């Protein structure tokens, strides 16, 4: 079949995950590495006994080939791929690794999966079902951010609860702290960038007594594609590539503020201290000043 000029000229980023039992993660890792190298893709792929989690970029043609060939593995047959603007240049290299977890909550033994995905996770809601739940249950609905607190500085669902966590490893301690016990009998909508973190987080929450837990199909990305900035989402979405953030429309609110001068901004920069490199929100003027640091180092 002939390849169109558009497929060769245009580039894309693919985001995907699939929870399914994998008997030999190392074999899958070697196959995925060879496949990506043959197609000229860059990005990051994690594989464990629980499944696969990846973000890759390259030509539109290469991405289409990658999605088709990855779905040939029986466990990945129904895997959904999210397409985004960008390409191989958005990632410094290709990294394909085997890990204990494809999302590092520090609880590999607690997570259970079968061919249908995570066992005991939160109920999946499509974006329109999220809005319907809020229409029906009103302020009783709690949006619970399943990302690092830093990510929520530039975008979040309206009135969301944002846990004080720096990494996903902090969530279990945070959930068990008692701070969120008031939510245990409320409808809780967990959310994250593409949905994968909430597959695990919602199961961890249910295991700890949260009675009515939901998760958004496709995460913030899918909700934003559906409603742009006319729904319940506000601000920019933090992303883990060179773009750093993305917006769903030109009407996106600017929720972040420069840590140095207070000006509105949605862009993170690395601290100028080479031994720190903490990511901090800075406006362009302050980011250009080598004297400005994160204030913690």
Curated annotation (Swiss-Prot):
Domain Rhodanese, chain residue ranges per copy: 137-232
SUPFAM superfamilies given in the database record: Rhodanese/Cell cycle control phosphatase
Chemical reaction(s) catalysed: uridine(34) in tRNA + AH2 + O2 = 5-hydroxyuridine(34) in tRNA + A + H2O
BP terms from Gene Ontology: tRNA modification
Top-level enzyme category: oxidoreductase
Catalytic-site annotation from UniProt: 192 (cysteine persulfide intermediate)
Domain of life: Bacteria
Assigned EC number: 1.14.-.-
Record's keyword terms, sorted: Oxidoreductase, tRNA processing
CDD domains: RHOD_YceA
GO molecular function, one term: oxidoreductase activity, acting on paired donors, with incorporation or reduction of molecular oxygen
Family from the record: Belongs to the TrhO family.
The protein's role, per its UniProt record: Catalyzes oxygen-dependent 5-hydroxyuridine (ho5U) modification at position 34 in tRNAs.
Protein name (Swiss-Prot/TrEMBL): tRNA uridine(34) hydroxylase
């Amino acid at each position: 079949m002939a390849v169109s000029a558009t497929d060769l000229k245009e580039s894309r980023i693919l985001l995907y995950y699939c929870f399914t039992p994998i008997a030999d993660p190392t074999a899958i890792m070697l196959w995925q590495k060879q496949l990506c190298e043959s197609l000229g893709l860059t990005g990051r792929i994690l594989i464990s006994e629980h499944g696969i989690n990846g973000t890759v970029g390259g030509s539109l043609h290469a991405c289409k080939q990658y999605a088709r060939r990855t779905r040939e593995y029986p466990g990945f047959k129904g895997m959904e791929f999210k397409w985004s603007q960008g390409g191989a240049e958005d990632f410094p290299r290709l990294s394909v690794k085997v890990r204990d977890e494809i999302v590092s909550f520090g609880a590999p033994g607690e997570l259970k999966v079968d061919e249908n995905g995570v066992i005991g996770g939160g109920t999946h809601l499509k974006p329109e079902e999220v809005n319907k739940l809020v229409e029906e249950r009103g302020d009783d609905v709690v949006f619970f951010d399943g990302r690092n607190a830093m990510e929520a500085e530039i975008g979040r669902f309206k009135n969301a609860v944002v846990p004080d966590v720096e990494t996903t490893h902090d969530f279990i301690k945070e959930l068990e702290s008692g701070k969120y016990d008031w939510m245990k009998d409320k409808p809780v909508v967990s959310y994250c960038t593409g949905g994968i973190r909430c597959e695990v987080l919602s199961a961890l929450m249910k295991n700890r007594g949260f009675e009515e837990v939901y998760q958004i199909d496709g995460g913030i990305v899918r909700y934003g594609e559906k409603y742009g900035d006319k729904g319940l989402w506000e601000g920019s979405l933090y992303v883990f590539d060179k773009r750093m953030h993305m917006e769903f429309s030109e009407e996106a609110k600017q929720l972040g503020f420069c840590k140095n001068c207070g000006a509105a901004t949605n862009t993170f920069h690395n601290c100028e201290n080479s031994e720190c490199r903490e990511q901090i929100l800075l406006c362009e003027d302050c980011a250009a000043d080598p004297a400005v640091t994160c204030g913690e180092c």
